[in-house]
Amino acid sequence: MDPQRTAAHEMFDADVASNRLGIELVSAANGSAVARMPITEGMVNGHRIAHGGFVFLLADTAFALACNSHGPATVAAGADITFVRPARQGDVLIARASERTRYGRSGIYDVTVSREGGEVIAEFRGQSRTLRPLSAPDREPEPGERDRAPAGGPGRSPGTGYR
């Protein structure tokens, strides 16, 4: 892998939803990320403002890029958003994610979504969880592993090798 590319870049390349919505990865490294997205006609609701789900998706994408910039596969454990003001068709939104803290396999990240000119649209906070690789079947389980679902059972993402 190119040394300037992180695991987040690899993840983003495979992110069909974000790419189809026109989200652009601006940067991702060392627990931070920047992503941008234009608000198109197909993203506005009945009030003719950007649907909050699209704003959330942009923030969530920046969050995912920031927490995956360290390497091991990391997923959202929870997230919430506060909408400060509406975005409109034609706006270009920038989401800036920053790591607040990491502890064990968990982390907290803040994302500010703003218009290109800097006006804040929304504030997002995400909680992350780094996944553990599945244990090899030919070794003794670690303490507590016996309580996990068997390979291929509930809790396993098919084809990922992670729980």
Please report, for each region that a protein language model flagged, where it lies by residue.
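Compact, glycine-rich, soluble single-domain proteins
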Residues: 45-64
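HotDog/MaoC-like acyl-thioester-processing domains
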Residues: 1-2, 70, 87-89, 98-163
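Hydrophobic beta-strand-centered segment that forms part of the acyl-chain substrate-binding groove
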Residues: 64-94, 99
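A generic structural signal for short beta-strands and their flanking turns/coil linkers
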Residues: 19-21, 31-33, 52, 73-79, ...
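Short, charged/polar surface micro-motifs in flexible loops or helix N-caps
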Residues: 30-31, 39-43, 62-63, 89
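Non-catalytic linker/capping segments at the edges of enzyme domains
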Residues: 1-36, 40, 139-163
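Hydrophobic residues in beta-strands and at strand termini
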Residues: 37-39, 83, 130
